[in-house]
């Protein structure tokens, strides 16, 4: 008799199911950042301990390296109205009196003013359509529909801003996760204290708990703190639907590892130190950049 079972090394989607009461989902950030909860799991014994996040410094050794993602979240959600729609019969865009809103979520910068976005509703964001944002501050021309229904758009900043990023600062809002329903009072609380390079559509949340003081304490122990870069994109927003996790394909994301960062990580590892990735984004960078020698 053949059992229809996966090898234990292969994970199913159901392996990740768990109950999380809504009342246990924090709607506002704790102050200070490093006073949040920390769960420690001993990978050898399976023992679980509950600590405060700042206690993490007690578990870091002098020869270790802490790898952080210094991406910065942009106010990537903008709402506008379709100004022109593409008329197939005429073969050109014509002015429309449509009043329904069109929402774009910027995911990935392709080049200069061309971005991959999520659009809703899709019927108001077809190739050839032109969307107006901020009563003439910026327009977006829908160029193409690509994998996953993403819209490739070209932005044209018309007034009050010098570039797309400046226009987003005027018009955009932070794309908070759907389980956060409270208004974000301070946008900097959705940034890590070491955020540097704008480009993410969501925060690398594991890093939100670090404070400058905690990072200084970690460095004082002799541990190196090394930045890499991953701009969080579509992969964060698309749900996993495949039953076998190995069949899930992640959307590509922009990453960068400088030569200095690679050298420091490799040196620490060669000397017996541990590589401690802050969150899945830093881990994905290292997994993607590693060669056959690790």
PLM-predicted stretches and their roles:
Residues 2-294:
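Surface-exposed, charge/polar-rich loops and edge strands
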